[in-house]
Amino acid sequence: MGIILSGSPSSVNVENAPDVDIQFLIQHVPVFGICYGAQLTAKIFGGRVDKSEKREYGRALFEVKKEDILLKDISPTSQVWMSHADTIIKLPDEFELLGTTESIPVAAFKRNSNGNCSLYGLQFHPEVYHSTEGKTIIKNFLTN
C-alpha cells in the first residue's frame, strides 16, 4: 500500500501551489511522486525546481543510472512520456538519483531514510501508454 502524488498543471514555485504534508505521509505509507508530485517532494526536502528552458511534452529516452527495486525488470534505456514546464535541477542531499533523460538531469529518484525507502519520484508519467515500461514501474512500487 502507498500513496501516489500525481501531476498538476501548476508550478511548485507559485504562491498557493497545491501542497501536502509529505513528512506526515512518509511516516505511515510509502509515497510515489509523479511529475508535479516528484517536483513537490524534491522542493519540500530542500531540492531546487526551476522553470524549464522550454516546456517538455512528448517522448523521451529514460536511462537507468542506479539499479533499484523500483526499476526492477526495466531496460537500461526505455521510452517515457514527459509533460512538464518545471524541472528538478538539484536533488536534496539525502536523495539518490536513479535515472535521467537527455534533456533533464533528474528523471527518477528515491529518498533513503534509515535504510528504508519511503519516497520515490519520477519526472515522467509512467501511467501513460507511451511510457513503454511504466506499468512495470508502478507495479514495482505497489508490490515492493
PLM ranges: what are they?
Residues 1-34, 39, 45, 139-144:
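Flexible gly/pro-rich beta->alpha loop and the following alpha-helix that scaffold active-site loops
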Residues 30-32, 96, 118:
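Proline-centered loop/turn at the N-terminus of a beta-strand
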Residues 35, 84, 125:
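Active-site glycine-centered loops adjacent to acidic/histidine catalytic or metal-binding residues
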Residues 80, 86-88, 96-98, 112:
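N-terminal leader/targeting and accessory segments in enzymes
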Residues 81-82, 98, 119-124:
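Active-site-proximal beta-strand elements of phosphoester/diester hydrolases
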Residues 104-116:
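Short, surface-exposed beta-strand/loop micro-motifs that present aromatic residues
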Residues 115-118, 123-144:
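Acyltransferase
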